[in-house]
Amino acid sequence: MAGSEPVRAEGETMAVDAAPRKPRILLAASGSVAAVKFANLCHCFSEWADVRAVSTSASLHFIDRAAMPKDVILYTDDNEWSSWKKLGDSVLHIELRKWADIMVIAPLSANTLGKIAGGLCDNLLTCIVRAWDYSKPFFVAPAMNTFMWNNPFTERHLISIDELGISLIPPVTKRLACGDYGNGAMAEPSTIYSTVRLFYESKAQQGNGDI
């Protein structure tokens, strides 16, 4: 046996000089056309962290699955109960919540924002959110039409998720996929990545490696 785990006098073991593991990032996409950038987002994070990905049924219309990093598993609603056979078997949305250090939804559609704010959990993604441990960081990067972004419901929903402790990576103003010009475009994958990584590393420094 390798000598990296000496036995204490009390019989307990303790790893010594073990290499720190990579951060575990759970990336999720909901049904916005900005999900065309999801594979790029996964590539950004996979160079730094262990990544698992979740997609809603609507987001699959836009995600190029062939462009996803080969080492990133993409979970869909079909996976939620496919491995569950009997009481005691693992439940995917619970296991993903346990696994992740940080969750990031990018893009966050108006529909999924409304579901989260209302506590709904009718797919894999929203079940993870409903079961999330809010002592762990959670980021969202909304993407929607300018009029949807400016809708009074959106303001109410953003207040609700802020009260949960979810951090907002705000949308940007540009020409949108629908042709309109205005605020509502998802932040660039590089911006989302740098925001989350800076947060993680600053917290790790403050807490000697723990976030």
From Swiss-Prot:
GO biological process: coenzyme A biosynthetic process; photoperiodism, flowering; positive regulation of response to salt stress; response to abscisic acid; response to cold; response to lithium ion; response to salt; response to sorbitol
Organism, as annotated: Glycine max (Soybean)
Subunit structure of this chain's protein: Homotrimer. Interacts with CYP2 in the plasma membrane and nucleus.
Chain's role: Involved in plant growth, and promotes salt (e.g. NaCl and LiCl) and osmotic tolerance, probably via coenzyme A (CoA) and endogenous proline accumulation. Catalyzes the decarboxylation of 4'-phosphopantothenoylcysteine to 4'-phosphopantetheine, a key step in coenzyme A biosynthesis. Favors seed germination and helps the onset of flowering. Required for roots development.
Induction (UniProt): Induced by salt (NaCl), lithium chloride (LiCl), sorbitol, cold and abscisic acid (ABA).
Keywords: Cell membrane, Coenzyme A biosynthesis, Decarboxylase, Flavoprotein, FMN, Growth regulation, Lyase, Membrane, Nucleus, Stress response
Name of the protein in its database record: Phosphopantothenoylcysteine decarboxylase HAL3a
Subcellular location, record wording: Cell membrane; Nucleus
Protein family membership: Belongs to the HFCD (homooligomeric flavin containing Cys decarboxylase) superfamily.
Binding site for FMN: 31-33, 56-58, 109-112, 143
Cofactor note (record): Binds 1 FMN per subunit.
Major place of residence: membrane
Binding site for N-[(R)-4-phosphopantothenoyl]-L-cysteine: 145, 175, 177, 186
Catalytic site positions: 93 (proton donor), 178 (proton donor)
SUPFAM superfamilies: Homo-oligomeric flavin-containing Cys decarboxylases, HFCD (SSF52507)
Gene: HAL3A
Keyword Cell membrane part of the UniProt annotation: yes
EC main group: lyase
Reaction equations catalysed: N-[(R)-4-phosphopantothenoyl]-L-cysteine + H(+) = (R)-4'-phosphopantetheine + CO2
Entry's EC annotation: 4.1.1.36
The keyword Hydrolase is annotated on this UniProt entry: no
Other information: The cv. Suxie No.1 (SX1) is more tolerant to salt stress than the cv. Tianlong No.1 (TL1).
Alphabetized GO MF terms: FMN binding; phosphopantothenoylcysteine decarboxylase activity
Cofactor(s) required, per the database record: FMN
Tissue: Mainly expressed in roots, to a lower extent in stems, and at low levels in leaves and seeds.
Site positions per UniProt: Important for catalytic activity: 178
Metabolic or biological pathway: Cofactor biosynthesis; coenzyme A biosynthesis; CoA from (R)-pantothenate: step 3/5
Assigned GO CC terms: nucleus; phosphopantothenoylcysteine decarboxylase complex; plasma membrane
